Amino acid sequence: MLTLTQLVTPNPDVAITLTLFLTAEERCRSRHRFETEDGQVVFLRLPRGTLLQDGDILQDETNGNLIRIAAKPEPVLTAVAQTQLLLMRAAYHLGNRHVPVEITPTYLRLSPDTVLRTMLEHMGLEITAEILPFQPELGAYGHHHPH
């Protein structure tokens, strides 16, 4: 069993013991028990409010293991628009609903929701249901990383 207690600065020269695949929602948990695909138990015991991102490195309480966090593929809706203005309008409306959204210059990505899908389609966006890593914005008041 591993207990992960601190976020460390990424270093490409360190040996990673394990990669832990977590959904966007799971990456918001600072204290939780996870089980890896091979059955290994991993506990997160991080400072309250810690938000993990794809590529973050965590260290266990013995300082002997480094674990990389990876965004786990999960069901998402990807929205694309004919114009950037339409995409910005859609981002505005999703933000008004406090919906976690991954924002890029060419698409918006959100968790599946039939009401939001219908709203976006009525606005003229093309929606595709996919299974991909989801990396929503942390928000203006989100956790700040040292990297």
UniProtKB/Swiss-Prot annotation:
MF annotations from Gene Ontology: nickel cation binding; unfolded protein binding
Keyword terms: Chaperone, Cytoplasm, Nickel, Nickel insertion
Predominant place of localization: cytoplasm
Subcellular location per the Swiss-Prot or TrEMBL entry: Cytoplasm
GO cellular component terms attached to this protein's record: cytoplasm
Biological processes, Gene Ontology terms: protein folding; protein-containing complex assembly; urea metabolic process
Domain of life where this protein originates: Bacteria
Family matches, as Pfam families: UreE_C (PF05194), UreE_N (PF02814)
Function: Involved in urease metallocenter assembly. Binds nickel. Probably functions as a nickel donor during metallocenter assembly.
Family: Belongs to the UreE family.
Name of this protein: Urease accessory protein UreE
Source organism of the structure: Nostoc sp. (strain PCC 7120 / SAG 25.82 / UTEX 2576)
Lineage: Bacteria, Bacillati, Cyanobacteriota, Cyanophyceae, Nostocales
Gene name for this UniProt entry: ureE
